[in-house]
């Protein structure tokens, strides 16, 4: 089987350099018509478009920032007649410890990562329905999964993408619209200054791109998934719930009861793996129903 993207149009935000360029190249190599966006603050996007087109790729560069999500999607449809998938990779950081972070720094980072993802999805939705479905891939970060010092805004936005994708999974299932999240790590010009050449070779961005392209393909059945990817390794991440502390609610439940049973709250020797909200909630209240 060879998964191809002929006659499909894919938008890649932040697609002119680093991981984004690798996504653009991978999709173009698979036959997609790729529209990639950049801030337009340099000539990089235009140069990448020229180089890739000379090599035979069907690519279009749009110097439109991700925050202008509605205009970006409408430009893609205007130029290409359709849109089949979106890879939301564009963004930036404005790092500061929480105590020193300004409202502007918080809002700017939330805007380019999370709010843009929402607006891209909402604007593309009717166009996806017109062509029989669509795929959304939101590029997250290990900072979103695990937190990172000085990146409260970035971490919150990047984990927020997962909640957005899970909701799109539920709302889009009936119309063949799916969404997934990938937290990649690759060597780029922004993070590789202190890397040795061996590490750079292992962490090439093109070793991450295939999972992003697969999740953007119409034949990929996955939706609502969260994945980590680096150096040709691809792993799915899921929630784990401890067996927990189950107190007798026929008696008053107090702070001291929770404190005394804290080891049970945090005991993962016999965990469950809820995959949806109802399943998680049942794990909390059903033990009481079964004991009645």
What annotation goes with each model-predicted range?
Residues 141:
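Residue(s) in the substrate-gating loop at a strand-loop-helix junction
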Residues 49, 60-63, 67-81:
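Conserved amphipathic alpha-helix within the SDR
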Residues 97-98, 102-107:
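Substrate-binding pocket helix/loop in short-chain dehydrogenase/reductase
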Residues 32-46:
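Conserved glycine-rich Rossmann-like NAD(P)H-binding loop of the short-chain dehydrogenase/reductase
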Residues 72, 181, 199-290:
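C-terminal helical subdomain
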